[in-house]
Structures are given as C-alpha cells and as structure tokens.
C-alpha cells in the first residue's frame, strides 16, 4: 500500500430517470472498473465514489423510503463487485460502504478499503436544494468524513458533493447554473467542510457548448476538442473569468474525450442533435500545492457499453492519487459566497417536493383519468 498518496476513483453518471435494476451488476461493474480489459492487472483504489443523478424518476425523488431498496441494491452490488475483484487477486474481502447520501433523484455512494483505512464516526451529510421554488428537482448532496490509514493518527477530511444543476441552453439557463452552484456550496459548506484536505464537486453540471451545432464536426479530432473547450465551453470560460471566476479553488484535469451528452438512447456513438453535444458531466477537485498532481490522474469518459445505453449521458471517471496532508492547518482555499435565502424557502421547498411527488404518482398510476372521468360523470348526472 502506497504510504504517500491516497488512491481514489470518482465516477458520475446521469441515469436518465431510469435505472434498470435487473442489469445493476453489469452497470456498476462498468462504473467501478472503466479501464478493466480483463487481461491487465487491475490496481484497486483506497476509495470508490459513485455519484448518480436522475437515478429514479424525478417525482419518485420525493419519497426517499420508496427509493431505499434501489439505493441499497446498488450499494450492495458495488461492494460485492469490489470484493469479488479482491478475492480473485488477493483472496480476502476488504471493501465496505462508508456512507450514502441522497437528495431527490441525486445519490452519492462512498466505498472504502476497511482493512487498511479507518474512518471517524462523525460523518457529515447535508443537502442543498436549488430546483424551482427550492425543490429537489435540482441540487447537491454532500458527504464529508475524516479518514486515516491503520497505524496512523494524522486524520484527513474528504468531502464530496454530487450535484445536478439547471438544464438547457442559453444565457439565462447558464446564469441559473451559476446561481445553483453558489447556492449549493453556501447551503452544505461550513468553515470545517471548506477546509477539507480533499474536496470534489461532481455531477451533471449541465454547462453547454455555445457554438452552433455543425453535423460535420469531428469529435475524434484533438484540434476540434481543444477549440470547442477553449473557446465555446461555458464552464471553462466561466472558470477563466477575471472578475469573478466560477468554482474558485477547484481545478479539473484536462478533458481529452468527446462530449458526454446528448446521445440517442440505445446507440453507442450517435448524438441526439436536439441538443448541442456538450460536456455536461464533470468532476472538479480542490486545488493542491503539489505541481505533479495533474500528472498522477486519468480523466476519461466511461465507454458506452451495452449496459449503459439506457441513458442519454455518458459517465465520466476520474482516477487519481491524492497528496497526503502535512497535518498543519491550511487557510480556506474554496471561495464560498453566502447565498441569501428567505426564512420561508425551506417550507416552500418541502411543499413543492410533496406536490411534485404526489402529482407524479397520480400521473404514473393514471389516477388523473379516473378523477377526470368521475368529474365528467358527476357533471353529466347533474345536467340530467
């Protein structure tokens, strides 16, 4: 086990409101081991983080108890997949679930090597809503914990936010995404979380390419990718802003893969041109004062195998070695702007969540037809 670095794998995946439970093992294996060719020796990580958006229909996100079985099944499947890999190579199970947190249809799952690592019990879990009227339609879910290696006492804090920001193209929607990011960071981060030794912000951030779509674009060309990413990609342009750069204190490894959205369902490489192909799915991490860090990670889209074709998004994985903390306090390096919220926003959001949930349930069960039919029958009887 490397004593100087943490080995971490982070994957984000928008499931498109539909997670086929019957195929959960194939899906989870692809997300955990995106670079496993079945031949080379696979290096297992200290931590595995799986971030999901739209893992269930949006209305179903209003009922956490209903979603618990699905989340538990995904978590158990992930643990079993990891321990099967361990058994095949080392013959000894060593992975378990460190924690799970959810907000609506957004979920984050953290798995760790419990034979080599220890975690303090005070795991923080927080949520920040930024959907319409403060609902869970959009938002972020945080899990934050302190961890060290067995035999060591230098605890380091890891924090992960899995987010789903405002969708669609255009300046107004871009500005709403900026507000969503600020609101989530403001709601879930206090000074302790902001000082985390290791901090990741991941998910379907929904930032778009602003250039007009050209059907002849060659996304396999590195020159084309560089031109789009440097000149027309919203998040990159916002992060380079001179006056108020977005995501200050975070950085991102160089993107070398084609856009991850929007694909035609059940097709591996064909984009749905109702939307401009964009890099919506991203993984940012806290900036380090270690110049070689960028050379110690891989940042790729996960191949769209048959198991993943049910979504119009392509998952993204970041596998990195993180530098160990020196143990000395560090100043706040993440810019967190206090987002103004009214005293009633929480209550309005709760009411909105309930309305979304029950209205969605009524439509799904076709109850609205029964209500409409009963109303028409009542009016007919009154007339007669």
Swiss-Prot record:
Chemical reaction(s) catalysed: a 1,2-diacyl-sn-glycero-3-phospho-(1D-myo-inositol-4,5-bisphosphate) + H2O = a 1,2-diacyl-sn-glycero-3-phospho-(1D-myo-inositol 4-phosphate) + phosphate
GO cellular component assignments: endoplasmic reticulum; endoplasmic reticulum membrane; fungal-type vacuole membrane
InterPro entries in UniProt: Endo/exonu/phosph_ase_sf (IPR036691), IP5 (IPR046985), IPPc (IPR000300)
Family annotation (Gene3D superfamilies): Endonuclease/exonuclease/phosphatase
EC number: 3.1.3.36
SUPFAM superfamilies per UniProt: DNase I-like
Membrane topology: Peripheral membrane protein
PANTHER family: INOSITOL 5-PHOSPHATASE (PTHR11200), LD06095P (PTHR11200:SF275)
Other facts: Present with 1200 molecules/cell in log phase SD medium.
The protein's name: Phosphatidylinositol 4,5-bisphosphate 5-phosphatase INP54
Origin species: Saccharomyces cerevisiae (strain ATCC 204508 / S288c) (Baker's yeast)
Primary gene name: INP54
């Amino acid at each position: 086990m490397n004593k100087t670095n943490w080995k971490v794998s982070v994957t984000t995946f928008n499931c498109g409101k539909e997670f086929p439970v019957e195929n959960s093992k194939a899906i989870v294996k692809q997300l955990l081991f995106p670079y496993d060719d079945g031949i080379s020796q696979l290096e297992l990580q200290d931590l595995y983080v799986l971030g999901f958006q739209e893992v269930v229909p949006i209305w179903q996100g209003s009922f956490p108890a209903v979603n618990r079985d699905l989340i538990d099944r995904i978590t158990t499947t992930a643990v079993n997949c990891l321990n099967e890999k361990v058994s095949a190579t080392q013959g000894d199970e060593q992975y378990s679930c460190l924690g799970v947190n959810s907000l609506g249809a957004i979920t984050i799952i953290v798995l760790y090597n419990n034979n080599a690592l220890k975690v303090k019990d005070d795991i923080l879990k927080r949520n920040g809503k930024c959907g319409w009227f403060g609902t869970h339609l959009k938002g972020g879910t945080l899990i934050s914990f302190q961890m060290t290696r067995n035999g060591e006492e230098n605890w380091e804090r890891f924090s992960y936010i899995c987010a789903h920001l405002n969708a669609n193209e255009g300046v107004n929607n871009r500005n709403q995404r900026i507000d969503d990011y600020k609101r989530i960071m403001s709601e879930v981060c206090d000074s302790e979380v902001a000082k985390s030794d290791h901090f990741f912000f991941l998910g379907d951030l929904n930032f778009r390419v602003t250039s007009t779509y050209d059907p002849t674009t060659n996304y396999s060309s590195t020159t084309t990718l560089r031109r789009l990413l440097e000149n027309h990609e919203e998040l990159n342009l916002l992060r380079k802003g001179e006056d108020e750069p977005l995501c200050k204190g975070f950085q991102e490894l160089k993107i070398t893969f084609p856009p991850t959205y929007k694909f035609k369902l059940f097709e591996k490489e064909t984009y749905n041109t109702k939307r401009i192909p964009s890099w919506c799915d991203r993984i940012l991490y806290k900036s380090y004062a270690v110049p070689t860090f960028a050379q110690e990670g891989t940042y790729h889209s996960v191949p769209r195998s048959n198991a993943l074709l049910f979504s119009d998004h392509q998952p993204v994985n970041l596998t990195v070695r993180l530098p160990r903390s020196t143990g000395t306090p560090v100043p706040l390096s993440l810019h967190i702007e206090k987002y103004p919220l009214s005293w009633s926003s929480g209550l309005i959001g709760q009411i909105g969540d309930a309305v979304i949930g029950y209205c969605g349930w009524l439509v799904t069960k076709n109850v609205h037809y029964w209500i409409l039919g009963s109303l028409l029958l009542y009016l007919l009887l009154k007339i007669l």
